[in-house]
């Protein structure tokens, strides 16, 4: 028992059913092999200190998440479901993760407590001698007379909950009279989700948050969910910085999937998102494939119109996002929409495209395998994760690897019984033992010199007789 070493990565693999359940709660699906690849091969290259064996350090997870969610070509939309699930494991750990969670995150919450005593000084300026003119204005009471004469509108504005916009540390020199009246009336309102979207790249993420702060559905200061639609700048940036669905369905599908996960949009938001990023024909194809993915009570795909319309309606449903039932409907709807995007993005079988995927000179075998699997998903109807397709993927991996790696893989003993994982490990070993460019130049130079020595003409000794 004491000889086995448990790492965060091995721990998640031992509890893979729980990991899949947690991912499902985040409205995403994760695959075990991609989980291992991203943790051990991809995220360590982000230069944030991510170990190859994984970690539950929340700071490192947040740094990797920032890299994954980076806009434009520097982002990794295909890795969003995996880092979101890692984050959920660390911030809301199940019992088998709690012993491994770093105890460092609680201290970042402490600075927020000392910030509370900063509020009383805000109420002192009205009593300060620096503002003597404010005292008579309060005693004269001109405002109550105006409010009573004007009737309801202004009274309603003052009695309603304040809008959810944060006053970011206002200087005490301006409008202290207004803040002095608003502060005792209630607590400071929550920050605006719309402002949070605009500040997202400047402010670090909150330590106790498990997901992105850019939510259309957000709990406001009165404890009720508040709705914030997509901004036009968000939609414009998503459309202009990504290829069309017909050109690269995988990339746009990954983008929409990440938006559905982080923003948790309503039914109307989903229609707006699809209408902006897809053409009319592409949208109809996605909706058709999503309705095909609806399953009945027996867990199998159903074609009953009432069940299909109940799960994936084409007309605006009466799902209230303020109720748990309405939110459950929206989660299921978004899952079906992701399935529709994935199925609609599959092109007709084109094995020539798959054969055209070859390993780059400096590309790791793990990264090459991911590109190869993506080609299978995009250009064939086959699932590369299906055990029945492992032989085909293995042969493609051998034949399309770099020449030096492919030759050594073909010479392996008992090649027929080697699994794809065995081939990848052997390819990684060969890749890591490759000679550097300097070593290669030195070897070529030595071989050239040896060849010249072997082919140099052997001249007989000439004895010169010099006569006196």
Curated annotation (Swiss-Prot):
A motif (LYPX(n)L motif) lies at residues 130-134. It holds the Pfam family Gag_MA. Residues 163-178 have a biased composition (Basic and acidic residues). Residues 111-222, 434-455 are annotated as: Disordered. GO terms for molecular function: RNA binding; structural constituent of virion. The record marks 131-132, 215-216 as: Cleavage. The keyword Lipoprotein applies. A lipid is attached at residue 2 (N-myristoyl glycine). This protein is probably translated as a Gag-Mos polyprotein. This is Gag polyprotein. It comes from Moloney murine sarcoma virus (strain ts110). The lineage of its organism: Viruses, Riboviria, Pararnavirae, Artverviricota, Revtraviricetes.
């Amino acid at each position: 028992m004491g000889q086995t070493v448990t790492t965060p990565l091995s721990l998640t693999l031992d509890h893979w059913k729980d990991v899949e359940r947690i991912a499902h709660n985040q409205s995403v699906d994760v695959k075990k092999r991609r989980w291992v690849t991203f943790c051990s091969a991809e995220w360590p290259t982000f230069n944030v200190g991510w170990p190859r064996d994984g970690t539950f350090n929340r700071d490192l997870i947040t740094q990797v998440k920032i890299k994954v969610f980076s806009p434009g070509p520097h982002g990794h939309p295909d890795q969003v479901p995996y880092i979101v699930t890692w984050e959920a494991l660390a911030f809301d750990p199940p019992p088998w993760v709690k012993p491994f969670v770093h105890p460092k995150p609680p201290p970042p919450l402490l600075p927020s407590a000392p910030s509370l005593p900063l509020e009383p000084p805000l109420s002192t300026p009205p009593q300060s001698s620096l503002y003597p003119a404010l005292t008579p204005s309060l005693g004269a009471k001109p405002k109550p007379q105006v409010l009573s004469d004007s009737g309801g509108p202004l009274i309603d504005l003052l009695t309603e909950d304040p809008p959810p916009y944060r006053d970011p540390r206002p200087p005490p020199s301006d409008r202290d009279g207004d803040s002095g009246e608003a502060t005792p009336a209630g607590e400071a309102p929550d920050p605006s989700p719309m402002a949070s979207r605009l500040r997202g790249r400047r402010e670090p993420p909150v330590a106790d948050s498990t997901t992105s702060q850019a939510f259309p559905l957000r709990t406001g200061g009165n404890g009720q969910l508040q709705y914030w639609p997509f901004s036009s700048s968000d939609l414009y940036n998503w459309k202009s910085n990504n290829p069309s669905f017909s050109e690269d369905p995988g990339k746009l599908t990954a983008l929409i999937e990440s938006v559905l996960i982080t923003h948790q949009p309503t039914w109307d938001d989903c229609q707006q998102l699809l209408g902006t990023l897809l053409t009319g024909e592409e949208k109809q194809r996605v909706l058709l494939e999503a309705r095909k993915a609806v399953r009945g009570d027996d867990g199998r795909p159903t074609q009953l119109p009432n069940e299909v319309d109940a799960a994936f309606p084409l007309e605006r449903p009466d799902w209230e996002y303020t109720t748990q039932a309405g939110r459950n409907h929206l989660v299921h709807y978004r899952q079906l929409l992701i399935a529709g995007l994935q199925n609609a993005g599959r092109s007709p079988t084109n094995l020539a495209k798959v054969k055209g995927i070859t390993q780059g000179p400096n590309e790791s075998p793990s990264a090459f395998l991911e590109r190869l699997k993506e080609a299978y998903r995009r250009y064939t109807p086959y699932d590369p994760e299906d055990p029945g397709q492992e032989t085909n993927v293995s042969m493609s991996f051998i034949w399309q690897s770099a020449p030096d790696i492919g030759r050594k893989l073909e010479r392996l003993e008992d090649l027929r019984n080697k699994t794809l994982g065995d081939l990848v490990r052997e390819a990684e070993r060969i890749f890591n033992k490759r000679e550097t460019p300097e070593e290669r130049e030195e070897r070529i130079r030595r071989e050239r010199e040896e060849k010249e020595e072997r082919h140099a003409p052997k001249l007989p000794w000439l004895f010169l007789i010099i006569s006196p």
